[in-house]
Amino acid sequence: MQREKDSLIVVSGGMDSVTLMYEKRASIALALSFDYGSKHNARELSFARLHAERLGVEHLIIPLDFIGQYFQSDLLLSGGDIPEGRYDEENMKSTVVPFRNGIMLAVAAGLAESRGLRRIYIANHFGDHAIYPDCRASFIRPMTEAVRCGTTNGVLIEAPYTDITKTDIARIGASLGIDYAETWSCYKGGVFHCGVCGTCVERKEALHDAGIPDPTEYEG
């Protein structure tokens, strides 16, 4: 019997959310992306759109212009340079977009309730915890309860990658046959991945540690 498509996924076009979309594709009715003024938004969104179309999933892109206009973060077009080097708290703290996941999950909750969908998937993972407060289990748990209590149909948030690493995610993706050349990580948002910013370094390490050949085209 075919499973009911009762879920929404927040998908950026990066490795993690694309992997989750393929893993949960049997239940996903809607893929939701946000244009919030980040340096890499355009590159990410093109891949979010590609994979949604490939899976036959409706795809919405909702603009969140106010984030780029009023929030402070070097990840935004309005911010400073993207730091290079390792993906760790000290190096990447300038790229925190305040309460980004909270805002996106709130919008996703309203949309899920409007569509009669029962579940929201989000692909935060263990490696994000030290850097981004709204990727931690200590945020996801109460946000899940708030959304459940605040929606008439008791919408649930599911974040199945919260306690696993990006290497683990890469292995899942490989088992699903995902071509990671068709995903975007680089925060600089150029024509090619820069290869030296924190997210590029994390991407390289995850694929290497998973034993997966890196198909990414890097600058130089």
Swiss-Prot record:
Superkingdom of the organism of origin: Bacteria
Cofactor note: Binds 1 zinc ion per subunit.
Cofactor: Zn(2+)
Catalytic activity: 7-carboxy-7-deazaguanine + NH4(+) + ATP = 7-cyano-7-deazaguanine + ADP + phosphate + H2O + H(+)
A GO biological process held by the record: queuosine biosynthetic process
EC code(s) of this entry: 6.3.4.20
GO molecular function: ATP binding; ligase activity, forming carbon-nitrogen bonds; zinc ion binding
Keywords in alphabetical order: ATP-binding, Ligase, Metal-binding, Nucleotide-binding, Queuosine biosynthesis, Zinc
Binding site for Zn(2+): 186, 194, 197, 200
Positions that bind ATP: 11-21
A Pfam match: QueC
Pathway per the UniProt entry: Purine metabolism; 7-cyano-7-deazaguanine biosynthesis
InterPro entries: QueC, Rossmann-like_a/b/a_fold
Cited function: Catalyzes the ATP-dependent conversion of 7-carboxy-7-deazaguanine (CDG) to 7-cyano-7-deazaguanine (preQ(0)).
Family membership: Belongs to the QueC family.
The protein, known as: 7-cyano-7-deazaguanine synthase
Organism listed in the record: Porphyromonas gingivalis (strain ATCC 33277 / DSM 20709 / CIP 103683 / JCM 12257 / NCTC 11834 / 2561)
Lineage: Bacteria, Pseudomonadati, Bacteroidota, Bacteroidia, Bacteroidales
